[in-house]
Amino acid sequence: MALVTAPTKACVVNPLKMSQPIGGAYAFMGLRGAMPLLHGSQGCTSFGLTLFVRHFKEAIPLQTTAMSEVATVLGGYENLEQAILNISKRAKPKIIGICSTGVTETNGDDVEAYLKLIRSAYPQLTKLPLVYVSTPDFKGAFQDGWEKAVARMVEVLVDRPSANGLRDPSKVNVLPGCHLTPGDLDELRALLEDFGLYPSFLPDLAGSLDGHIPDEFTSTTIGGIDVDEIASMGRAGWTIAIGAQMQRAAEVMQTKTGVPFRVFERLCGLHPNDDFMMFLSEISGRPIPSKYRRQRSQLADAMLDAHFHIGGRKVAIGAEPDLLFDLSGMLHDMGAQVTVAVTTTQSEVIERIRTKEVLIGDLEDLEGFAKEKHCDLLITHSHGRQAAGRLKVPFYRVGFPIFDRLGAGHQVSVGYRGTRNVIFQIANLVIAHRDENDRPTPDRWRTTPGLPQHVGHRRSTGAPERSIA
């Protein structure tokens, strides 16, 4: 069991974590026709918007109530009212997801009461879902905001089943964690459909942030799960929660609708995917398709090939708790040592990470301990690239944001195929780094000062130079 330690510094230097409001807004982006709204100052929203645009390279729907100094003191009712009216009139969304920020949380705005007043004053908003989630950015992290938003969606949007309501055993709810990419969700959807199951993802980022060009412009999200489909999730046969962060949302779903659930804390690795495949075979009543048996064999072969390069490595990882747990488990299976583990917030899984200590800290902590313990592989998001350069170690980018590489939304790490790809990517990074920095080459052989650096035979002194026609 890992020892979890809290930071003792008076401030955060080079932050690792992203804030709760951004995580909450990210969850609402997986709903069709949605408009996430941050109840706070313009700066809060513009900073988050910049991160999303740089990560996905897409147009991102995100609005603000634009709280000023005066509004912050007197209360944000008028700002929230005006923002909702403007959005409903101009963007015509199917749902508005409202996330609080540190400014409005500190002031103590009762947003739930505000929404009741707004609905009573404007009958045209009666049928427009307004979902509010409390996400103060002075505590918690990105994963906490996502977790709260999804649980709140289940509470507000999912209908209770009728007394004689029938369940569809082939219909499955999937509650993915924030550490999964749109590419991961596409992979999971194909996998579930191969078992004859019909999945409903909440949220479904694969439909809205997968990088496709829509037929026509819309200022809201261009895809995702529809509000009507969310309402019918109570008629599913099972709920699959991916990541420990989704335990709460799955419990809310079961309490409200009676749908049983199972949590899969990891889907990157051989044994976690074996368990996942067996579960899908059990609930569908179908054998595991031969294509996945072949993919399993390919993953086993990839692990054999790559363990020469990954096994024994000292790894430093900085990530959200579920992503840290997922990657560290896979690397441990490959024989690597997770020597430094830094995360952003508390979670029940971090105590079970196979390392001596997990620090809730920042990138300065990650770099400092990686240097102290002589780590030779660094894994975190793009803000860790300078640390990797100073440490002169291979750098594998994961999490959010990844803004200095393309295709962040299409990375796949789930399933046999996704795990195989991650293993190859990390092993190739290690090989390339060794070739560039450690392997001797002819231009490094002559390192003694004074020796000629040119290649070729030496002419005798005084001999005339002959030209070659």
From Swiss-Prot:
Molecular functions per Gene Ontology: metal ion binding; nitrogenase activity
Alphabetized UniProt keyword annotations: Metal-binding, Nitrogen fixation
Domain of life of the organism encoding this protein: Bacteria
Record family assignment: Belongs to the NifD/NifK/NifE/NifN family.
Binding positions for [7Fe-Mo-9S-C-homocitryl] cluster per the UniProt entry: 44
Pathway(s) of this molecule: Cofactor biosynthesis; Fe-Mo cofactor biosynthesis
Summary of the function given for this chain in its UniProt record: This protein may play a role in the biosynthesis of the prosthetic group of nitrogenase (FeMo cofactor).
CDD domains for the chain: Nitrogenase_NifN_1
Annotated source species: Bradyrhizobium diazoefficiens (strain JCM 10833 / BCRC 13528 / IAM 13628 / NBRC 14792 / USDA 110)
Keyword check for Metal-binding: yes
Encoding gene, per UniProt annotation: nifN
Name used for this protein in its record: Nitrogenase iron-molybdenum cofactor biosynthesis protein NifN
Listed Pfam families: Oxidored_nitro
